[in-house]
Curated annotation (Swiss-Prot):
Phylogenetic lineage: Bacteria, Bacillati, Bacillota, Clostridia, Moorellales
Example GO biological process: translation
Species annotation: Moorella thermoacetica (strain ATCC 39073 / JCM 9320)
Pfam families: Ribosomal_L9_C, Ribosomal_L9_N
GO CC annotations on file: ribonucleoprotein complex; ribosome
Name of protein: Large ribosomal subunit protein bL9
Gene name in the database record: rplI
Amino acid sequence: MKVILTADVAKLGNRGTLVEVSEGYARNYLLPRGLAVEATAGRLKELDLEKKRREKKENQELENARRQAARLDGAVVKITTRAGETGKLFGSVTNKEIAEAIKNTFQISLDRRKIDLKEPIKALGSYEVTLKLHPTVQAHLRVQVVAEGS
């Protein structure tokens, strides 16, 4: 029997996948638990439309990530913060502060989780930061940390 999965099922497939299973498995396990629906012509058409919509959205996200990477790759963001006499910061520069600096400088709103810091920034200086804009698109940004009043 052909069914369309409505949820991720271990060892069978992910949501939205068309799979062939035995009649008993479908009728006694998948269908009663709402893990799948019977594959009819209408549902197959609906599944195809959903896949096309999802592909279009993914392509738009990829194109948007590429545009952002083109603007941000090799760019420099300046962050001003309080520091002691020796150049050590009072606290550290976080992903959130870098995301705010990118938004203020380039008008690009970026989720802080997409910013990959190799180590915490705890001193003045220039640091290389990797931006993971999409699973296949990365950009490298230089963060320059300067003391207030300099």
